[in-house]
């Protein structure tokens, strides 16, 4: 193997490794409604073990607002308290927690 081939091979290996190291990118929004962030829109990079999440708040069948974030130990669930429903959604792909 000549030196150019060795360097090319090394570069491919390093770039492949960087793809695995890159963190999960999530949408972050303090308050969203009607598919739009209305307060504090940004992005966060999930730490190891975290996922992207959306917490949606409903009264009856009416969507009141949602919140998007990076979440540690996210578990999907529905919480019913009388007329209020809170739905927690977790996902693990870049920008999967859209507004």
From Swiss-Prot:
Domain UPAR/Ly6 as annotated: residue spans: 24-99
Predominant subcellular localization, coarse grouping: secreted
Keywords: Calcium, Calmodulin-binding, Disulfide bond, Secreted, Signal
Induction line: By castration in the ventral lobe of prostate. This induction is suppressed by subsequent dihydroxytestosterone administration.
Protein name as it appears in the record: Prostate and testis expressed protein 4
CC per GO annotation: acrosomal vesicle; extracellular space
Disulphide bridges, residue numbers: 26-52, 29-37, 44-70, 74-90
Organism taxonomic ancestry: Eukaryota, Metazoa, Chordata, Craniata, Vertebrata
Protein family membership: Belongs to the PATE family.
One record GO biological process: modulation of chemical synaptic transmission
Role: Enhances sperm motility. Binds to calmodulin and inhibits calcium transport into spermatozoa. May modulate the function of nicotinic acetylcholine receptors.
SUPFAM superfamilies: Snake toxin-like
The encoding gene: Pate4
InterPro entries on file: LY6_UPA_recep-like, Snake_toxin-like_sf
Superkingdom of origin organism: Eukaryota
Annotated organism of origin: Mus musculus
Pfam families: UPAR_LY6 (PF00021)
Subcellular location: Secreted
